[in-house]
Curated annotation (Swiss-Prot):
UniProt key word Transferase: yes
Family per record: Belongs to the class I-like SAM-binding methyltransferase superfamily. RNA M5U methyltransferase family.
Key words, A-Z: 4Fe-4S, Iron, Iron-sulfur, Metal-binding, Methyltransferase, S-adenosyl-L-methionine, Transferase
Protein name: Uncharacterized RNA methyltransferase LIC_11085
Length: 454
């Protein structure tokens, strides 16, 4: 318990680093999380409480244990992007996975396979930089949405993207009145987005403006300068609400190239629309795909692709099936899936259905789908929150024989697997790390229905 006098200062020593890559210390029985810290660091901790809010803590560094690893980025601890450049990658991966490893051993008597990152920098295929008056171009400040840290380069995006960022910074310096001022509600340019394919050479640059900039003399002048200065294969202007803080969304104008870029995954071509989600690190995600390819059993007819998006998994593994059913809630993504599947695999019986899997109305449709055959293989790649109660309930009564559960949040994944433990047996689990310098992981669990016999 905290002292009644919340203004008292206490001293706390960091004891360990948790899976979120934050140092953990204690004041009496109260846990303190400290970013950018390591075991042995000592802090003065002063608690304070605002009305109707939980107590907060002010931290003051007293002493710091010797660092053996120097962060390569000068903006580290100021920029809100990376959180672990002060930790060697080997230790990062150990911190991120150790608690998961132990909990799977304890709760499921299974040892996950761990696959660390092969590339720890220059791996992301998309970065969104806010543009503020100054001009300032950068990422949100750690712990603050109102301020950004000016960045000349970013070590987790590609070198080609950094070259384009350099060109843009030189360009925008000649237009000091163009950046949108959130305080005075003046100016036009809000975001600068870079999307660089990993397995092709294509680069896309997207500039997001307020709607009022469209069809102005200033827009035409800036368009001409962009075409002369920027080198991306695809250059787009995007226009959306003045008060909206969303990048690369809205009405577009194509200055150069197309509104999508080409990426290759497992030898298959994907057209990635300017405003759509795609795996941030396709190279780092490849172990997940290799795992599924190896474990998919032979002689199964039907693939069910839940949370299918634009049909990423369907297209990669379609050659193993006679029929594919994809389900998602976003019609624009489903249209892409239908079009690409009909082009790539015209002889496969494929259908992509619009269903909100987090709505109770999905229950009846899922139960019909999951009870159709013993020859079904399921791949599900849900959002961070997990499968949701309606998918879980449908799976408990299903005839699905084999189930691949892909997750960007292994913690919620493990919680879902515990709820399914009486119905499915975990065969194998792979945990991999496409996102070094951050606390995020990707994992895939391969499950077999308990009452299924081959």
């Amino acid at each position: 318990m905290l002292d009644k006098n919340t203004n008292l200062t206490h001293q706390s020593k960091i004891e360990f680093v948790n899976s979120n890559l934050r140092g953990i210390g204690f004041v009496n029985n109260t846990k303190i999380e400290v970013p950018y810290s390591l075991p042995g660091d000592v802090y003065n901790v002063t608690f304070f409480k605002k009305k109707r809010r939980k107590p907060s803590a002010k931290l003051e560094l007293v002493s710091q244990t010797q660092r053996s690893f120097i962060p390569p980025c000068s903006a580290f601890t100021k920029c809100g992007g990376c959180c672990a450049q002060h930790i060697s990658y080997q230790d990062q991966f150990r911190y991120k996975t150790s608690s998961l490893l132990e909990s799977y051993k304890k709760d499921f008597e299974i040892v996950p396979t761990l696959y660390p990152a092969q590339k720890t920098f220059y791996y992301r295929n998309r970065m969104d930089f806010a543009v503020f008056p100054g001009p300032i171009v950068g990422q949100r400040e750690a712990g603050s949405f109102r301020h950004i840290v000016d960045l000349e380069t970013c070590l987790i995006q590609s070198k080609e993207s950094n070259e384009e960022l350099y060109r843009f910074r030189n360009l925008i310096s000649k237009f000091p009145n163009l950046p949108y001022d959130r305080k005075s509600d003046s100016g036009f340019l809000k975001y600068f987005t870079l999307r660089k394919a990993k397995n092709t050479s294509e680069l896309m640059t997207i500039l997001t403006f307020v709607e009022e900039f469209k069809n102005t003399i200033e827009e035409k002048e800036f368009e001409n300068v962009c075409l002369k200065s920027l080198k991306a294969d695809h250059i787009l202007f995007c226009f959306n609400r003045r008060k909206g803080e969303i990048s690369a969304t809205g009405e577009i104008k194509i200055l150069k190239g197309m509104d999508s870029y080409k990426e290759l995954v497992c030898g298959k071509e994907f057209r990635v629309p300017f405003d759509s989600f795609f795996q941030p690190n396709p190279e780092g995600f490849q172990p997940i795909l290799d795992f599924i390819e190896k474990e998919i059993p032979d002689s199964f007819d039907h693939l069910v692709d839940l949370f299918c998006g634009s049909g990423f998994f369907s297209r990669i593994f379609a050659h193993k099936f006679l029929k594919i059913t994809g389900i998602d809630s976003i019609e624009s993504s489903l249209e892409i899936a239908r079009k690409q599947m009909s082009l790539d695999f015209p002889k496969i019986d494929s259908s992509y259905l619009k269903v909100d899997l987090f709505s109770k109305h999905s229950s009846s449709k899922l139960k019909v789908l999951f009870s159709s055959s013993d020859k079904d293989v399921l791949i599900a790649d849900p959002p961070r929150a997990g499968l949701g109660e309606f998918v879980l309930d449908a799976l408990k009564d299903s005839k699905v024989s084999y189930f691949f559960y892909v997750s960007c949040n292994p913690t919620s994944q493990k919680s879902d697997l515990w709820k399914l433990k009486d119905f499915f047996q975990i065969q194998k689990i792979l945990i991999t790390d496409p996102y070094p310098q951050t606390p995020h992981l990707e994992s895939v669990a391969f499950l077999k229905r308990k009452n299924f016999t081959t």
